[in-house]
């Protein structure tokens, strides 16, 4: 079954990918006209535009469950009076995901491809294999990706096989004597390398690296990652924050559009929490649910059908004993 095509030129939604159709959509992208729309329509359109770029590999309920209303920012100095773009931090909680951080480190051409690397067991976190693409990285976590898989994902050339095998195939000689002699020489060289503890490195075995076309548009590394391309690993230093006039969350959309998306998600979050509270009140009575009100079995709180005579006697009790005579 053919996969769904995510780079529609008609819809023009942006994706975190190096695909040529996505780059074309970025080049001709225009902000949606929200003048003659209601407030809810503005929020919905802003959510649709920003949601396609931030976390397209997630379902809507997954993003709503992981949404964090708290937006983090820092002030560098008192002299810098530029406003802090807090609203651009709406999707900052997605940047700590394992698959998204691999894409930001330029080890995969898209977030979906980074997720595929994690599911196939090509990623190690702190020296241990990790198959959960939704894992939230903590500051100081070391992520290592398989080098050959990175070359297959990032390089445009299909000839990424080791050069040792290519050398064996190209150095074939018609005579059997020449083949035996060269095989012996190669075996002796490999034996010397292994005995001395020197194996061919990844730079020597992999053919020439050819970057993918249109890669330069997204070839940047955020400030919260420290990347080492020689070992295909990176360190998640800290969570992204907003500074005066600067945000560390990469996004092609302005702050106003992120503000509308933030109000949409914060409204849906409050509605879900309110519905959960109402459901809890309907299912569990307040006197049974709260320990301060509970003072016995539930039968004590059920109302009894009392006759008016009994109610009057309870209100105005009559002394049953006889009065003593006064002498």
UniProtKB/Swiss-Prot annotation:
Residues 96-154 form the S4 RNA-binding domain. PROSITE patterns: RIBOSOMAL_S4, S4. The keyword GTP-binding does not apply. Residues 156-199 are annotated as: Disordered. Residues 156-173 have a biased composition (Polar residues). Residues 174-186 have a biased composition (Basic and acidic residues). One of its GO terms (biological process) is ribosomal small subunit biogenesis. Its main location: mitochondrion. CDD domains: S4. One of its GO terms (cellular component) is mitochondrial small ribosomal subunit. InterPro entries: Ribosomal_uS4, Ribosomal_uS4_CS, S4_RNA-bd, S4_RNA-bd_sf. Belongs to the universal ribosomal protein uS4 family. This is Small ribosomal subunit protein uS4m. It comes from Schizosaccharomyces pombe (strain 972 / ATCC 24843).
